[in-house]
């Protein structure tokens, strides 16, 4: 996405790799999220699927049905990646990523700005949430990392991240080897 001199997006085009949510996706997501409060109506599209065809990352609408803002554009839904994020967080990788962000201020600032523009571009009401990635204060704390789940979801779902090299190194494989997550009746 290009940003012109006035800070406005010169080209708001949605990624062509996003796909609509299918009936099978809805069934699977309801099973995966049966222990969470998960509002399927907030889902705009599937941003990424694994090689087994299951949703890994969802694109969420920037506003809930009642109109309140929802700043998280990309939502990680893959159980394998969810577990991997938890493992990395337990190894204090959030701090490491924040330190890396501090060495890439221009890239991180652009990432937050383009994320906000993308989020606004899919808004049905034109809601303008004045924050960066996942609701992070992109002005006051641009290097803050809320969680690795948000980072992984944005990296995989948007295919754009200022620390893509670091994420690739830390995550290695971005999916499980057997598609077990498609069977939600037993743990993956």
PLM ranges: what are they?
Residues 2-188:
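Preference for intrinsically disordered or flexible, low-complexity segments
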């Amino acid at each position: 996405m290009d940003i012109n001199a006035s800070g406005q997006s010169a080209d708001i085009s949605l990624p062509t790799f996003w796909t609509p949510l299918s009936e099978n996706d809805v069934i699977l997501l309801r099973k995966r999220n049966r222990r969470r409060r998960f509002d399927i109506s907030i889902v705009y599209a599937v941003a990424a699927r694994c090689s087994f065809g299951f949703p890994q990352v969802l694109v969420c609408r920037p506003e809930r049905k009642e109109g309140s803002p929802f700043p998280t554009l990309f939502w990680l839904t893959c159980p394998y990646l969810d577990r991997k994020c938890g493992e990395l967080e337990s190894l204090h990788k959030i701090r490491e990523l924040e330190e890396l962000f501090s060495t890439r201020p221009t890239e991180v600032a652009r990432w937050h700005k383009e994320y906000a523009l993308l989020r606004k571009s899919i808004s049905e009401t034109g809601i303008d949430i004045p924050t960066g990635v996942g609701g992070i204060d992109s002005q006051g704390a641009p290097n803050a990392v809320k969680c690795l789940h948000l980072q992984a979801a944005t990296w995989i779902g948007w295919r754009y991240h200022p620390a893509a090299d670091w994420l690739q190194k830390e995550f290695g494989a971005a999916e499980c080897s057997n598609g077990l997550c498609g069977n939600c009746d037993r743990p993956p």
